[in-house]
Regions:
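Iron-sulfur cluster-binding electron-transfer modules in prokaryotic oxidoreductases
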Residues: 31, 140-470
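Cysteine-centered iron-sulfur cluster-binding motifs in ferredoxin-type domains/subunits
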Residues: 66-86, 114, 118-138, 397
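N-terminal glycine-rich anion-binding loops that anchor highly charged ligand groups
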Residues: 77-81, 91-96, 267-272
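Active-site-flanking structural segment that lines cofactor/substrate pockets
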Residues: 104-119, 221-231
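Short, intrinsically disordered, charge-biased short linear motifs at domain edges
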Residues: 57-70, 110-121, 262-265, 385-390
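Conserved glycine-rich FAD pyrophosphate-binding loop
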Residues: 1-50, 54-55, 62-68, 92
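Signature of N-terminal electron-transfer/Fe-S-associated modules in redox systems
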Residues: 50, 71, 89-90, 105-114, ...
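Non-heme iron-sulfur electron-transfer modules
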Residues: 47-59, 86-116, 137-165, 453-463
Length: 470
């Protein structure tokens, strides 16, 4: 059997129909000889180090993709087997290397921002698994976000634009999302949800169906205290980001985060006026909105904090990018430098944990493991709980298909990835699935429900809180 990325390419592509790809016209413009080779790239501004022109081929200011970043790919293909969409489709242009070819071709003026170009970029999850694999340090996530910014400025088709207007007008705004969730709670409790699902009334509307299938029982959450003092020896003062989805759908995660941090010796400040961190906007290329939200968040938190604690992987990853997108001198960048995932602080504490007799497995949220490089801390915390047997999840860092709002925009691809994730969970015989991101929790819980798996899907702080007791 052939080995390496090239062998994986052949194996994954083996089941596809023969004949030209639907994307062949654009692929031929990027790869005239039908192969992915660097010699097909022409000489242009992208090949001149240090050049930052006002216009770069099909791209224009502001927020041009970095020419040095585009040039840094050496076309080795190590990223290909790590890319979820490439694993599913086996298409070069739906791999990191292929997408970089498209971006670079557009930057060199050999390719315009066409619907086909946009489609390949839209199918990317932005999981950054390619960055973890890349020996050259290609900043794929930043290049993707900048390119999506270019696409957004060009405008979308009416259907996509309407869906994005709904999503971005609702999810990042807790004051709007809260009333919407209360209506959804009525939908659930009235029996209407059971009727809609039994009759499959949403089958003709895949994106709406995907949104409805994610629904969990909407909890009744209370407001967190503005300050909870440390218990015992004081270690310092932290602020808690409550998030948008987290505070409304998983309020218990925030409440237990405060309790655990307090028991670990931290004063916990939770500003009631804090808003969205902008993660969804960054991933979607809405860069001006992202910057505005970042500035507002920085103003909401006092400067006299040792750390900003985040318990949602997507939020933490986006906040750590503030310096890049707003400049290192910006107040938001100072907040980013203080940002820590909750597991990074709790792993330093010596909490008295009681036994939990269960089998658990851990899913690496993409924006925790690839976006922030946090892999060992959550596992170390779970391993400390007496009686809890931690079983490694096969392909633990393969995206579950949530990816922010990807599962709403691209439900078919998201479901294919979710099916593979649930297969792996079932293989562990675990009764607890642990993940550090609310989007992953919703997505994986949906998959386990559909499969009929008796698996409880929890955040790491929920498991630790059970072991800590009252």
């Amino acid at each position: 059997m052939p080995g390496g990325a090239e062998g994986a390419h052949r194996r994954l592509g083996a089941g596809r129909p023969a004949g030209p790809s639907a994307h062949a016209p654009d692929q031929d413009r990027v790869r005239p000889d039908g192969r992915a080779q660097p010699r097909t790239l022409c000489e242009s501004a992208v090949n001149r180090p240090g050049t930052v022109p006002a216009r770069l081929g099909a791209f224009s200011e502001p927020d041009l993709p970095d020419p040095d970043g585009l040039r840094s790919c050496v076309h080795c293909g190590i990223c290909l087997p790590q890319c979820p969409t490439y694993q599913v489709l086996g298409e070069e242009m739906d791999s990191p290397r292929g997408r970089l070819y498209l971006m670079r071709a557009a930057a060199e003026g050999r390719l315009d921002i066409t619907p086909t170009f946009t489609r390949h970029l839209d199918l990317c999850l932005g999981c950054r698994a390619c960055e973890t694999a890349c020996p050259s340090g290609v900043p794929f996530g930043r290049l993707l976000e900048a390119t999506r910014g270019q696409i957004e400025r060009r405008g979308r088709g009416p259907a996509r634009r309407a869906l994005e207007t709904l999503i971005f007008g609702l999810f990042p705004h807790p004051r709007r999302l809260g009333p919407a969730l209360r209506l959804l709670a009525l939908y659930q409790r009235s029996g209407l949800q059971s009727l809609v699902r039994a009759l499959e009334l949403l089958r003709p509307f895949p994106r709406l169906r995907a949104m409805e299938q994610l629904l969990v029982t909407v909890p009744r959450g209370g407001r967190l205290p503005a300050l909870v003092p440390a218990v015992g020896a004081r270690r310092g003062r932290v602020g808690l980001l409550t998030g948008c989805v987290q505070r409304l759908i998983y309020p218990q995660v925030n409440a237990e985060t405060v309790r655990l941090l307090s028991r670990a010796g931290w004063d916990v400040v939770t500003p009631p006026g804090q808003g969205c961190c902008g993660a969804l906007h960054l991933h979607g290329g809405r860069l001006d909105e992202f910057r505005a939200l970042a500035r507002a968040l920085a103003q909401a938190f006092p400067e006299a904090l040792d750390h900003l604690v985040v318990n949602a992987a997507g939020c933490g990853s986006a906040i750590r990018e503030y310096g890049h997108w707003l400049g290192e001198a910006a107040p938001a960048a100072a907040l980013a430098r203080k940002t820590r995932d909750v597991t990074e602080l709790l792993v330093e504490a010596d909490l008295p944990l009681r036994p939990i007799e269960a089998v658990a497995t851990y899913h690496d949220a993409c924006h925790l493991v690839h976006g922030q490089g946090i892999r060992s801390a959550p596992r170390a915390l779970l391993a400390r709980i007496p009686g809890l047997r931690l079983v490694e999840l096969p392909e633990s860092d393969l995206c579950c298909g949530s990816a922010g709002v990807y599962n709403l925009l691209e439900p078919q691809m998201a479901d294919r990835l979710l099916e593979r994730k649930v297969d792996n969970i079932a293989a562990t015989s675990a009764t607890l699935l642990v993940a550090g991101n609310p989007g992953c929790l919703l997505q994986i819980a949906k998959g386990c429900r559909a499969r009929g798996l008796a698996v409880e899907v929890l955040h790491p702080v929920e498991v630790l809180a059970r072991a800590l007791g009252s």
